[in-house]
Amino acid sequence: MKILSLSLLLLLAATVSASVPGLIELVDSKTIFGNVAELLEKEKLSINYANCRSWHLGVETSNIIDFDTVPANCKDYVEDYLITSKQYQYDSKTVCKEAYFYAKGLALKNDTVNVWIFDLDDTLLSSIPYYAKYGYGTEKTDPGAYWLWLGTGASTPGLPEALHLYQNIIELGIEPIILSDRWKLWKNVTLDNLEAAGVTYWKHLILKPNGSNLRQVVYKSKVRKSLVKKGYNIVGNIGDQWADLVEDTPGRVFKLPNPLYYVPS
């Protein structure tokens, strides 16, 4: 049975009302639906995202985008997810395990260099120490503050699951390429960060030109195109933002969890 639209029902009601006076009184739409805010609250759809786990799911699936900060009421949830419960580690392990199984089953080309592209921040290295200082993403910081923090030589510890994948990829005969949106200005501190995490080998470490304001998704897409033109066979990509993984992305992509911030894609 087809469901009549609201407008059609109102039209029918008006017709019947005209032919039979007093039978039906049309009701104003405001009376029907009430206050929108009250409806949202009633249906648990308010922008406060009282269910932080559902908010997080929306972030990871790219249904919730363009958020400036983590909802204030989700601070404890994010801290528990990242630190206390170890769910972050479990989720990352699942992603990296699937990436390894995929890579292990590949028929690699013999006439070219097979490469796997790794994002850097919150893929191989963690920014959690920085965001922990600002309410686990609930406090808004100045643009560029993270990069200035990096410049102080601050520690960005390695993320064990992605580091394990990195080692496995090398053992499979696939060359790792690290593609970061850090400016070349931070090359020395980046090398220190990587060495401290045990990352000492790569085919290329690609950093963004100093002062570049190119959007991350555009910048990384251009780099991938350039690598393909040079003859590299990109078999896989892994990152914590969809901006790392969309637009002209050869090979399969693997998305790591990150509830701390959003990079437009």
UniProtKB/Swiss-Prot annotation:
Q: Which residues form a coiled coil?
A: none
Q: Name one GO molecular function term.
A: acid phosphatase activity
Question: Could you tell me which CDD domains the record lists for this protein?
Answer: HAD_VSP (cd07535)
GO annotation, cellular component aspect: cytosolic ribosome; plant-type vacuole
Tissue note: Highly expressed in flowers, but also found in leaves, vegetative shoots, petioles, peduncles, and receptacles of floral organs.
One GO term of the biological process aspect: response to wounding
Q: Which InterPro entries match?
A: Acid_phosphat_B-like, Acid_phosphatase_pln, APS1/VSP, HAD-like_sf, HAD_sf
The stated induction of this gene product is: Expression is enhanced during wounding.
Q: Which domain of life is it from?
A: Eukaryota
Listed A to Z, the keywords are: Glycoprotein, Signal, Storage protein
Residues that span the membrane, as ranges:
none
Glycosylated position list = N110, N188, N210
Signal peptide range: 1-18
- What does the function comment of this entry state? May function as somatic storage protein during early seedling development.
Family under the similarity heading? Belongs to the APS1/VSP family.
Which NCBIfam families does the record cross-reference, listed alphabetically?
plant-AP (TIGR01675)
Put simply, this protein is called Vegetative storage protein 2
| UniProt source species | Arabidopsis thaliana (Mouse-ear cress)
